[in-house]
Amino acid sequence: MDVVMKLNNIFSGLPKKKKSKVLGRGIGCGKGKTSGRGHKGQKARSGVSINGFEGGQQSIFTRLPKRGFNSLPKNKYSIINLSLIQRLIDSGKIDNVSAITKEVLYNLGVISSVKQKIKILGDGKLNTTVCIEYDFISKSAKSQVTLLNSLSDSESK
């Protein structure tokens, strides 16, 4: 006799999900009155858990010594080289007549946030006079920018 297995004749015999016991519904249900919490005391009340409490014993985090310290966050800033600024001017993305602000650099995708601090480094050569908004600048970059600005002042006179 061939038995064909079909969905309607499969039987596991056990329910897929065991029904949970209903608590606090009279002494006849098996979990009535105190609902399995025992009589009185802290654990019988609601909001039982007290983190780190070990029954009066000194807790583990007070037994162990304090170690280390939390250092202050470093000043995070974006580094921009003069070669990058010159490349942006040469490609026409930046107008060297107007000031190069954080908003301009953010719109070009050079910095990730307008609130971010900027440090200008003197890597590369700057050929045109520029007005740059910055928070920090290296000595070499400052000397290049001031040299170009002083040259442009002497040429205009």
From Swiss-Prot:
For this UniProt record, the keywords arranged alphabetically read as follows: Ribonucleoprotein, Ribosomal protein, RNA-binding, rRNA-binding
An example Gene Ontology biological process:
translation
What does UniProt give as the signal peptide span?
Answer: none
- What is the designated name of this protein? Large ribosomal subunit protein uL15
The family assignment reads: Belongs to the universal ribosomal protein uL15 family.
Entry annotated with the keyword rRNA-binding: yes
Q: What role is this protein assigned?
A: Binds to the 23S rRNA.
Annotated InterPro entries: Ribosomal_uL15 (IPR030878), Ribosomal_uL15/eL18 (IPR021131), Ribosomal_uL15/eL18_sf (IPR036227), Ribosomal_uL15_bac-type (IPR005749)
Where along the sequence do coiled-coil regions lie? none
Self-association state and partner proteins as the record states: Part of the 50S ribosomal subunit.
Q: Which Gene Ontology terms cover its molecular function?
A: rRNA binding; structural constituent of ribosome
Task: State any GO CC term.
Answer: large ribosomal subunit
Keyword Ribosomal protein recorded: yes
